[in-house]
């Protein structure tokens, strides 16, 4: 039986030839080329992301101003449900009726019922604001004094 350069017979060499590494498989130049290509691809990706981020930041400043201006132009019917503003220096019938949630021409019984309902929810002894309780009582007194029985 003839032996090959690997020290095996020719039939054994043919049998195991697919498992034996070739002379240049895994050489350092191939690894360096693959690593270099990968590093270049990663570098280009980082550079592209940086340029895209810079472009986005440049667009955001004027776009933010446009968005803010358009948001101011939008009508807010849902926000107009609540009364905007504080209390006036001297309470009038309109403000008193807004506080109690009744019409300015409501009867005394409706005013008392609304006052009772609001004071139960906002009594100072149960954690409510003393200032708000004072304003609620002032509104009740004003509406009752100007309303006919």
Curated annotation (Swiss-Prot):
Record InterPro entries: DnaJ_domain, J_dom_sf
Pfam families: DnaJ
Gene Ontology terms: biological process: pronephros development; protein transport
Gene3D superfamilies: DnaJ domain
Keywords: Developmental protein, Membrane, Mitochondrion, Mitochondrion inner membrane, Protein transport, Translocation, Transmembrane, Transmembrane helix, Transport
Mitochondrial matrix compartment spans: 58-149
Principal location listed in the UniProt entry: mitochondrion
Localization: Mitochondrion inner membrane
PANTHER family: DNAJ HOMOLOG SUBFAMILY C MEMBER 15, PTHR12763
Function noted in UniProt: Negative regulator of the mitochondrial respiratory chain. Plays a role in the translocation of proteins across the mitochondrial inner membrane. Involved in pronephric kidney development at the early tadpole stage.
Name the UniProt record assigns to this protein: DnaJ homolog subfamily C member 15
Organism encoding this protein: Xenopus tropicalis
Gene that encodes the chain: dnajc15
């Amino acid at each position: 039986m003839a032996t090959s350069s690997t020290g095996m017979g020719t039939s054994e060499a043919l049998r195991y030839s697919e498992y034996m590494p070739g002379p240049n498989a895994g050489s350092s130049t191939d690894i360096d080329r693959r690593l270099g290509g990968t590093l270049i691809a990663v570098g280009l990706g980082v550079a592209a992301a940086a340029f895209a981020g810079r472009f986005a930041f440049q667009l955001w400043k004027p776009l933010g101003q446009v968005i803010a201006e358009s948001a101011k132009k939008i009508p807010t019917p849902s926000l107009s449900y609540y009364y905007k503003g504080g209390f006036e220096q001297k309470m009038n019938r309109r403000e008193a009726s807004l506080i109690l949630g009744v019409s300015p021409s409501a009867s005394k019984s409706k005013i008392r019922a609304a006052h009772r309902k609001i004071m139960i929810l906002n009594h100072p002894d149960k954690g409510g604001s003393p200032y708000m309780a004072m304003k609620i009582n002032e509104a009740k007194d004003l509406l009752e004094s100007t309303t006919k029985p």
